[in-house]
Regions:
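Alpha/beta-hydrolase superfamily serine-hydrolase fold, recognizing
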Residues: 1-200
Length: 200
């Protein structure tokens, strides 16, 4: 079963909506036919930030056990200081200029005192989080912050599968008929299947 929230507002509204969806799934697992041992979060781009933030929230505040997090070219760091961000002013579909504008609008001016769920890389600790699949794209301004987040998870003892996909860009998977897209969708599906089988 896939549950998704519709996001249309500033921080923290999208995060609150995502957490509410996760809480609903956890609290109503029996009625929904959901196995709590096989509950995962996932998202791409800004949705990857929300998924990673939800995983942190589930660990710290909610008493919800997740079996997996699927993070596809995720936004993780509002500081935007990586090499790929500096190189990525004109990357296809998404670039550093748009990313800077997004953070300014989302955070309404700056990072301020927003907790790490707004920018998961700001977390004080990464231990105790669920295993992760982190996919990054070669020509994406977000490439390095995805790699950095995966490295932070691994350093904390979290099992992480990193897919650093060559020849791709942010949102490349909109081209559903392309062979490479099909290959990556299968890799993502395989990672989820493996996680769900372990949680069974």
């Amino acid at each position: 079963m896939l549950l998704s929230a519709l996001f249309q507002r500033y921080v923290p509204a999208a995060f609150a909506d995502a957490c509410a969806a996760l809480r609903y799934a956890w609290d109503n697992a029996a009625a929904l036919g959901i196995d709590r041992m096989r509950l995962a979060v996932g998202g791409d781009s800004a949705g990857g930030a929300l998924a990673a933030g939800c995983a942190q929230w589930a660990r710290d505040c909610a008493g919800i056990g997740l079996c997996f997090q699927l993070l596809l070219y995720p936004v993780t760091d509002c500081r935007m200081q990586t090499d790929s961000m500096r190189r990525g002013r004109d990357t296809p579909l998404w670039n550093a200029r748009l990313n800077r504008r997004m953070w300014r609008l989302y955070l309404r001016g700056g990072a301020g005192d927003h907790p790490s769920w707004a920018a998961p890389m700001l977390a004080e600790r990464f231990d105790g989080l669920p295993p992760a699949y982190v996919e990054v794209e070669q020509f994406d301004c977000l490439h390095d912050e995805g790699i950095d987040y995966a490295a932070a998870l691994q350093a904390a003892g979290v099992s992480v599968q990193v897919e650093d996909v060559r020849g791709t860009f942010h949102g490349f998977d909109v081209f559903r008929k392309a062979d490479l897209v099909k290959k990556q969708i299968e890799a993502r599906s395989r990672a989820l299947r493996t996680a769900f089988e372990k949680g069974a």
